[in-house]
Each structure stands twice: as structure tokens, then as C-alpha cells.
Amino acid sequence: MADWARAQSPGAVEEILDRENKRMADSLASKVTRLKSLALDIDRDAEDQNRYLDGMDSDFTSMTGLLTGSVKRFSTMARSGRDNRKLLCGVAVGLIVAFFILSYLLSRART
């Protein structure tokens, strides 16, 4: 960088400055290329994450619909009369037992 101060002729100084300028321009071009590549990677990653989140949104929407329907049917069954109370208790106990069996099996499968 300080070579231009030691040069004797004006042509030599211009040549040294020109080489240094080209070197710095090449360095800048490579940095710009890396930044552009990084920006494109970030853009692709953001698009992928948006698609993933949109898919999750539709999954949650469909699951909400299923749960809403199940709760409505369960509430209707609970309000329909005393004869169904035994059935309702049986279903509730069955679901609780199934939950514990499933959690036990999953804990055994992990180990």
C-alpha cells in the first residue's frame, strides 16, 4: 500500500495505484458476491419457513374443526338424559384408561 511513496516516476505511481485499486475492487466484488449469496439463502429459508407455517395453520384449523365437532357431540350426549350418564362415565373412564395405556407404551418404546 505504501509502495507508491517509494516510486520515482509518475507512471510508476499510477501503475501501483491502479494495481492496488484493482485488487481492492476484486476484494469488494467478492464480498458483494458473498453478501448476495447470503441474502438469497435467507430469502429461500424464509420462504420455506412460511410454507411450513402455512401448512401448520391448515393442520391446526382442521384439528380445531374436529375437536369442536367432538365437543358438541359429547355435550349433546351429556345433556340428553340420565340414561346416557352411565354411558358417558364409561366413555370417560375408557378414554382415561386408553390415555394411560398409550402413555405407558410410548414411554416403554423410548427406552
From Swiss-Prot:
Keyword Mitochondrion: no
Residue intervals on the Lumenal side: 108-111
Cytoplasmic side: 1-86
Keyword Nucleotide-binding: no
Chain positions with Phosphoserine modification: S9, S37
Keyword annotations: Coiled coil, Golgi apparatus, Membrane, Phosphoprotein, Protein transport, Transmembrane, Transmembrane helix, Transport
InterPro entries referenced in this protein's UniProt entry, alphabetically: BET1_SNARE, T_SNARE_dom
Principal place of residence: Golgi
Residue ranges constituting the t-SNARE coiled-coil homology domain according to the UniProt record: 15-77
Domain of life: Eukaryota
Any one GO cellular component localisation term in the record: Golgi membrane
GO molecular function: SNAP receptor activity
Record membrane topology: Single-pass type IV membrane protein
Residue stretches spanning the membrane: 87-107
GO biological process: protein transport; regulation of retrograde vesicle-mediated transport, Golgi to ER; retrograde transport, endosome to Golgi
Compartment(s): Golgi apparatus membrane; Golgi apparatus, trans-Golgi network membrane
Entry-linked PANTHER family: GOLGI SNARE BET1-RELATED
Function as written in the Swiss-Prot or TrEMBL entry: Vesicle SNARE required for targeting and fusion of retrograde transport vesicles with the Golgi complex. Required for the integrity of the Golgi complex.
Subunit relationships: Component of a SNARE complex consisting of STX5, YKT6, GOSR1 and BET1L. Interacts with STX5.
Protein name from the UniProt record: BET1-like protein
